[in-house]
A protein has these predicted regions:
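Residues lining hydrophobic/aromatic ligand-binding pockets adjacent to catalytic sites
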Residues: 1-192
């Protein structure tokens, strides 16, 4: 009741599902997760599953897990091991309408592939994990993409995680202002 209209909360699934169980036999864990999230009702935005580094691609495990996810929600996957960043995974996500998280982490930028009706971005830091401030040129590059996605009717969720020295809030505010300045009338932005 205290958030503005149109505001949604993104959630990140617990590492018990992604790092410990590695998407295997997770029905009970998924049920528990959604029992907690149901209080958000229409304010529930995408749920992120961040898979660990050094866990190699396992298409069949991912396929089984995706089938177990409840319908009517938005999900995104962030793959930290580069072996997952392949067309077969993108196709599997797209077939389920699940987003591929585009991310930037200490100089590595994942492929940017639209696999859903929304885009999910995590910016973890330009110089190292969770550190450094994004410069105007880099932000402008993201803004151009975001405006294009918004014009095409996609929702965009962008999160800054470069919070070690407090840069995340400033970068997010700057990006939001840049998106608003570059978005034509009639295209809704998250700020209104």
């Amino acid at each position: 009741e205290t958030t503005p209209n149109g505001f949604v909360f993104a959630s990140k699934a617990h590492r018990y599902i992604t790092h410990f169980k590695k998407l295997r036999n997770c029905d009970e864990s998924i049920c528990s997760l959604f029992n907690r999230l149901e209080a958000l009702e229409s304010k529930l935005g995408p749920v992120l599953f961040q898979l660990p580094p050094r866990w190699q691609v396992n298409i069949s495990r991912l396929a089984d897990f995706l089938v177990a996810l409840p319908e009517g929600h938005r999900f995104a996957f962030e793959f930290r091991d580069k072996s997952w960043l392949i067309p077969q995974v993108y196709d599997l996500l797209a077939n389920h309408g699940i987003g591929l998280c585009a991310y930037d982490l200490g100089g590595f930028r994942s492929p940017i592939v639209a696999t859903a009706d929304f885009i999910y971005i995590r910016l973890h830091g330009p110089k190292g994990p969770y550190s450094g401030s994004y410069d105007g040129r880099t932000l402008n590059g993201w803004v151009k993409r975001i405006v294009s996605w918004l014009r095409s009717g996609r929702d965009v969720y962008c999160y800054f995680d470069n919070d070690q020295l407090g840069y995340a809030a400033a970068n997010a505010t700057t990006m939001q202002q840049m998106v608003e300045r570059n978005t034509p009338d009639g295209v809704e932005t998250p700020a209104g």
